[in-house]
């Protein structure tokens, strides 16, 4: 009998006096459950990506909401067929979003619902910022959105400063979005510090928009940091036209692979024909390398376990080399 699984995305900023205790409690609980995850906990709160057998996932959601400080955590749920992380990983991270500077979380952009977001996109009077990575943007983004020209998220404060010089903060309304919402919590605050008077952030991120509005103003797929790599934002509409291109032949494609060359492991976009001809590698040079992992289409585009993508945070310090392709 086929089992039903949930994929959960969630975060919550709250004071955590003893992060190591929370980590230990999570690890002990997960020993008893059919789950996998990548969860970061710090004095700032929690940021989690999680998958689990449906009853176990529901148990965890109820359990976490009973923990001190986490009663208001909001979970975004996708229905999946299996666990999507290689293991249950729960770690300490000083910054839930790697930014390298202090941010006043009491001063944030206005959270607007997916419906309000959609209406503002139709009005087309705001500067729309996509505050994700380049490789996320490549396969999907909102119409008319701008991708900041930065290589790491630590460069965003400098970008915000430059933005305030290129656009009048007094008269330029700004809308920003990310996958689940956590990055906007910090970046909207930075824009307000730079004098922008009207800053909006998509409540719940692209995930919430897809669940509430369907595909709407979104184009392409949503990059996710797990074995799936890319998903339609609307679970009911999986027939999505690619907006990206194969890195080898430039055919329309949005399938990510990580290179079969162990010493490379680059994340790259590739079509079905080219992935065969290159033995699962990102270049001809890599296809002739001495340490090539066995590639088979039977495994789909599931990442190789070494340097697994789900162990690379969406707020990572260094961009994947695929960003330069």
From Swiss-Prot:
Function: Catalyzes oxygen-dependent 5-hydroxyuridine (ho5U) modification at position 34 in tRNAs.
Reactions listed under catalytic activity: uridine(34) in tRNA + AH2 + O2 = 5-hydroxyuridine(34) in tRNA + A + H2O
Sequence similarity: Belongs to the TrhO family.
Xref: PANTHER family: RHODANESE-LIKE DOMAIN-CONTAINING PROTEIN 7-RELATED, THIOSULFATE SULFURTRANSFERASE/RHODANESE-LIKE DOMAIN-CONTAINING PROTEIN 2
Enzyme Commission numbers on file: 1.14.-.-
Active site, renumbered: 178
Keywords recorded for this protein, A-Z: Oxidoreductase, tRNA processing
GO BP term (any one): tRNA modification
Name of the protein described by the UniProt record: tRNA uridine(34) hydroxylase
NCBIfam families per the UniProt record, alphabetical: PRK00142.1-2, PRK00142.1-3
Transmembrane segments: none
Entries under InterPro entries matching the protein: Rhodanese-like_dom, Rhodanese-like_dom_sf, Rhodanese_C, TrhO, TRHO_N
Keyword Oxidoreductase in record: yes
Rhodanese domain span: 122-218
Any one GO MF annotation of this record: oxidoreductase activity, acting on paired donors, with incorporation or reduction of molecular oxygen
Source organism of this protein record: Chlamydia felis (strain Fe/C-56)
């Amino acid at each position: 009998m086929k089992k039903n699984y949930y994929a959960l995305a969630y975060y919550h900023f709250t004071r955590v006096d003893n992060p190591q205790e929370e980590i230990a409690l999570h690890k002990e609980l997960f020993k008893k459950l059919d789950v996998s995850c990548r969860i970061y906990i710090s004095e700032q709160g929690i940021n989690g990506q999680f998958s689990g057998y449906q009853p176990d996932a529901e148990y965890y959601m109820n359990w976490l909401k009973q923990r001190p400080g986490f009663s208001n955590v909001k979970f975004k749920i996708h229905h999946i067929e299996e666990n999507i992380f290689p293991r249950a990983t729960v770690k300490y991270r000083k910054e839930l979003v790697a930014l390298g500077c202090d941010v006043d979380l009491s001063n944030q952009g206005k959270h607007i619902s997916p419906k309000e977001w959609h209406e503002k996109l139709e009005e087309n009077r705001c500067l729309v910022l996509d505050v994700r990575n380049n490789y996320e943007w490549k396969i999907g983004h909102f119409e008319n959105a701008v991708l900041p020209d930065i290589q790491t998220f630590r460069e965003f404060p400098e970008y915000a400063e430059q933005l305030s010089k290129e656009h009048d903060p007094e008269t330029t309304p700004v809308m920003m979005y990310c996958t689940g919402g956590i990055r906007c919590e910090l970046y909207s605050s930075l824009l307000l510090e730079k004098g922008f008077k009207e800053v909006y952030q998509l409540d719940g991120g692209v995930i919430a928009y897809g669940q509430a509005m369907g595909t709407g103003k979104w184009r392409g797929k949503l990059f996710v940091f797990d074995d799936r790599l890319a998903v339609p934002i609307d679970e009911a509409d999986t027939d999505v036209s690619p907006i990206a291109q194969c890195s080898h032949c430039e055919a329309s494609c949005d399938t990510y692979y990580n290179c079969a060359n162990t010493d490379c492991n680059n994340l790259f976009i590739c079509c079905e024909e080219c992935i065969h001809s290159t033995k699962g590698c990102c270049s001809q040079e890599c296809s002739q390398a001495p340490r090539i992992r066995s590639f088979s289409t039977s495994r789909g585009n599931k990442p190789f376990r070494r340097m697994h993508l789900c162990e690379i945070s969406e707020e990572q310090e260094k961009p994947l080399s695929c960003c330069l392709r």
